[in-house]
Amino acid sequence: MKILHLSDTHGCHRRLRDLPEADVVVHSGDFCMVGSEQEAIDFLNWFCDLPYRHKIFICGNHDDCLYGANIDGLDDNVHYLCNSGIEIEGLRFYGVPMFMSDCITDCQSRNYEKIPGDTDILITHSPAYGILDYDDGINYGSEEILTKLSDLHLKAHLFGHIHAQHGIKEQNGVIFSNGSIMNANYTIFSTPNIIIVENA
């Protein structure tokens, strides 16, 4: 399966042109800048119109307008994952958002703990600690995700959040993809990541 991975478009999704072919497109959060409902609606209209067989997205810390939202009316091939999963062509995707209301309580840690053990492709907004998470001399990734990774047998982990670490890394047989499109200054677009994952 060919996956197009992007993240952290921060309201500039319509500036993306000539996206490459893929079977599935995944957006791992921060499609908004200020978190307004209007931003989210514009993103959803754009995302739903993309010409991919399946489209998956989660929310990041800039997307709080969707906290607790029940998103109805999406096309059958558009999947909003909020501490939930979906199986596509034998591969099990699971998505954990990053809402600020959860981050300031212990809810976020509990959400990570609940990631199913049979997950093939994990989608989070935050990276795991020490993996494509470095900026300004600090590793900003989640230690809870890093701990959970040891319990999983992933094929890939897709995330964003740390703009300075856009890229792909393979470690212990797992593909790690930081799909952040914007740089640290919110000015330059990076090329979306393409990863290949073997179907189950």
At which residue positions do the language-model features occur?
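Core dinuclear metal-dependent hydrolase active-site scaffold
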Residues: M1-L16, C82-P116, I181-A200
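Active-site neighborhood of phospho(di)ester-bond hydrolases with catalytic His/Asp-centered motifs
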Residues: H5-S7, V25-D30, K55-N61, L81-C82, ...
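Core catalytic region of metal-dependent phosphoesterases/phosphodiesterases
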Residues: L6-I88
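Short, solvent-exposed loop/turn segments at secondary-structure junctions
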Residues: H10-G11, C32, D63-D64, M98-S101, ...
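Active-site-proximal segments of metal-dependent phosphoesterases and phosphodiesterases across multiple
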Residues: E37, G117-H153
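Charged helix-capping and loop-helix junction motifs
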Residues: A40-L44, V78, C107-Y112, G137-L146
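Binuclear metal-dependent phosphoesterase catalytic core
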Residues: G85-E89, E144-L152, A156, H163-A200
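A short secondary-structure junction signal
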Residues: I104-C107, S126-P127, I131-G137, K169-E170, ...
